């Protein structure tokens, strides 16, 4: 796992969306860049936003549970089918998967220095995922 990779499973959905951290009060990504927004004072010396940690030390604990939609022990940011319904997250989010491998775009997968899938075959992704029934749960998580 690369802690600097904004999309660990390359499905076109930012890890902060898949993890559930944006449901915490005061934690936002208003510019949709996959990085939690806030003034420097909102982050502790360990780099974590103060609203998601229990202290500012290197061994801080998260104060929220990372989302595991299908309760299989693998957190959503690391799964291509978070809800285990047989349909990959990239498609449920409303994005394109030209070769049906669960990864945004076609092979070879090209990522930039932030871990975002890039290249000529990328035509969408990294926007707000679909919630077609408007129940505030993204389709890839239900």
Feature map (PLM): residue ranges:
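Extracellular calcium-associated, cysteine-rich motifs in secreted modular proteins
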Residues: 1-142
């Amino acid at each position: 796992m690369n802690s600097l990779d904004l999309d660990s499973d390359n499905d076109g959905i930012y890890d902060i969306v898949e993890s559930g951290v944006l449901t915490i009060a005061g934690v936002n990504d208003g510019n949709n860049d996959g990085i939690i927004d806030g003034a420097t004072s909102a982050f502790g010396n360990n780099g974590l936003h103060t609203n998601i940690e229990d202290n500012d030390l290197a061994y801080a604990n998260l104060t929220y549970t990372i989302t595991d939609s299908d309760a299989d022990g693998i957190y959503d940011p690391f799964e291509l089918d978070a809800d285990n319904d047989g349909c990959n997250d990239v498609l449920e989010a409303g994005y394109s998967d030209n070769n049906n491998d669960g990864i945004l775009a076609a092979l070879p997968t090209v990522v930039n220095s932030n871990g975002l899938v890039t290249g000529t075959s990328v035509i969408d992704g990294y926007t707000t995922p679909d919630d077609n029934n408007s129940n505030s749960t993204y389709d890839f998580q239900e």
